[in-house]
Amino acid sequence: MSNHLSSDSDISSTESMLCGGIAGMVSRFCIAPLDVVKIRLQLQKDGSRYYRGIFQTMQQIVRDEGVTALWKGNIPAELLYVFYGATQFVTYHHVNQVINAYNETAEKWKISSGAQSFIAGATAGAGATIATYPFDLFRTLFAAQGAKNCNVKNYTSLFQTFKLIYKTEGPLGFFRGVSSSIISIAPYMGLFFASYGRVKDSLDAFSNKHHDLLVSYNLPTKGWQEATAGLCAGTASKALVFPLDTIRKRLQTQGRMDVSYKELSGKPGVQRLLDSYNPFVMARRIIVAEGCRGLYKGFLVSLIKSAPTSAITMYTFEKSLSILRWWKAQGKSLEA
């Protein structure tokens, strides 16, 4: 089975965008509950023991707010994942094309396939993050304010949240914490795409070599490579960059979960609530107040979330591409 994310893939920009958007939408809906749990754990300050682990947190949310609370903030999150997936995959495709063109003309200092996947993945991750960051911000705020120990209800809808942040902080308010997001997501996606390609190629080779053995044990020979490669790549990449994700969530909610944020909207006094846009300052605060382990709050649930997310995303991307091409082929055959 071919790897449609390889540097020499024949996939088009339209296919990348459409299949990337579908993959983002499907994966988001499946992992939304784990994302809500992760955000609650990440934003819980040291000393509070209201949420004490994945399953207890999930049970507590359902008990306090109902089952639908596990999909709280899902509308902005779905928009985030659809646009993020589409932007990420089409950017990855175009960066690969640029590097291919460079390698064809370069006499020396050519970029290796592994480095190419990392560069294309990192660029795609950074570009998609910037393009969709306001949706990520809204998703975090909606998920955070649902907590039982949070008495703030500043945000009621996408439009109301947009107006409130714009009035209080101006256009730059929609991008608070974006630097830490880029710092965390760029290497994460670079590592993800680089390792995904390697792992999938190895799994394809294994499947081809041991085809008869797999058949003899009634094991599938196709369809599992994408999900398995995505799972492995997502797990390894997430483990390396998680502290930066915690810093990003703290920057996004800092001050905005304060009762007086809404009251001070449009007034100079609001700046006292928004005293740090610096990820390094935020990292120092977390370490001083909570120790280094504060940077890893919600790590287990994030790891559990990122693995199936990556698996579902890559599987859906490859399968939706296969369906799209089958549909196009059927159309051509009917015309003929």
Swiss-Prot record:
The chain crosses the membrane at residues 17-37, 66-86, 118-138, 177-197, 228-244, 298-315. Its main location: mitochondrion. The keyword Mitochondrion applies. Solcar repeats lie at residues 11-98, 112-202, 221-323. One of its GO terms (cellular component) is mitochondrial inner membrane. Coiled coil: none annotated. It is found in: Mitochondrion inner membrane. It is a multi-pass membrane protein. GO terms for biological process: thiamine pyrophosphate transmembrane transport. One of its GO terms (molecular function) is thiamine transmembrane transporter activity. It comes from the Eukaryota. Keywords: Membrane, Mitochondrion, Mitochondrion inner membrane, Repeat, Transmembrane, Transmembrane helix, Transport. It holds the Pfam family Mito_carr. Belongs to the mitochondrial carrier (TC 2.A.29) family. PANTHER family: SOLUTE CARRIER FAMILY 25 (PTHR24089). This is Mitochondrial thiamine pyrophosphate carrier 1. It comes from Yarrowia lipolytica (strain CLIB 122 / E 150) (Yeast). The lineage of its organism: Eukaryota, Fungi, Dikarya, Ascomycota, Saccharomycotina.
